Regions:
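C-terminus-biased signal that marks the final domain/tail of proteins
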Residues: 1-168
C-alpha cells in the first residue's frame, strides 16, 4: 500500500521523508520517515483488510489524482524554464518532487491517525459528514462491532479444536 508520487531524474535533493531521517533504516523507526509511515499504515490494514482498505484506497486515489492532474502543467512550466535557464528548471522540478513527497507523507500520516481512531480495538467508530460522531453529551458515539468473517472463524475453530469451546 503506497502512493505513486512524481520524482524527476534531474532532482538533486532527496525529499527529507525519503532519506534516512533521524537515522531511520530497517531497524530504526522514525515518525519522519515515509518508509516507516507507509509501513505503519500497511501493518494496521493487514489484519482487517476487508474493513480498512476502502479508506486507504480513497486516500491513495485522491493523492494520485491530484498529482496526475497537475502533471501536464508542471511539465509545461518546467519545459519553459528549461528553454531559458536549465538550472531553474532543475530547481523547479526538485522543489516539486520534494513538495509532492512531503504532501504524500503528511497525508499518509493523517490516514494512519484516522485508521487507528476509527478501527481501534476491533470496532468501527461511527462517522457522519466526515467526522466521528458524538452523543448528546459530547462523548464518542456507540461503535459497530463487525466481528470476523465466517471463513476466518471456521478456520480458527479448525486450528484450535475444542480449546475455546464453552463447557455444557
Amino acid at each position: 500500500m503506497t502512493v505513486f508520487t512524481p520524482v524527476y531524474c534531474c532532482t538533486d535533493k532527496v525529499p527529507v521523508c525519503y532519506s534516512r531521517v533521524d537515522g531511520a533504516d530497517y531497524i530504526t523507526f522514525s515518525w519522519n520517515s515515509s518508509f516507516w509511515i507507509f509501513n505503519w499504515v500497511s501493518n494496521m490494514v493487514y489484519p482487517r483488510y476487508d474493513l480498512i482498505i476502502g479508506d486507504v484506497r480513497a486516500t491513495q486515489n485522491e493523492l494520485e489524482t491530484t498529482f496526475n492532474e497537475a502533471q501536464e502543467g508542471i511539465e509545461s512550466a518546467a519545459a519553459k524554464l528549461l528553454e531559458k535557464d536549465p538550472a531553474k528548471a532543475k530547481a523547479f522540478l526538485t522543489n516539486y518532487t520534494n513538495m509532492t513527497a512531503q504532501s504524500a507523507f503528511d497525508t499518509w500520516k493523517r490516514l494512519g491517525e484516522f485508521i487507528i481512531v476509527k478501527y481501534n480495538d476491533g470496532v468501527v467508530r461511527k462517522m457522519k459528514d466526515g467526522k466521528f460522531e458524538r452523543n448528546a453529551i459530547g462523548q464518542p458515539a456507540g461503535v459497530v462491532r463487525p466481528g470476523y468473517p465466517k471463513e476466518f472463524l471456521e478456520e480458527y475453530v479448525k486450528q484450535t479444536g475444542d480449546r475455546y469451546k464453552m463447557p455444557d
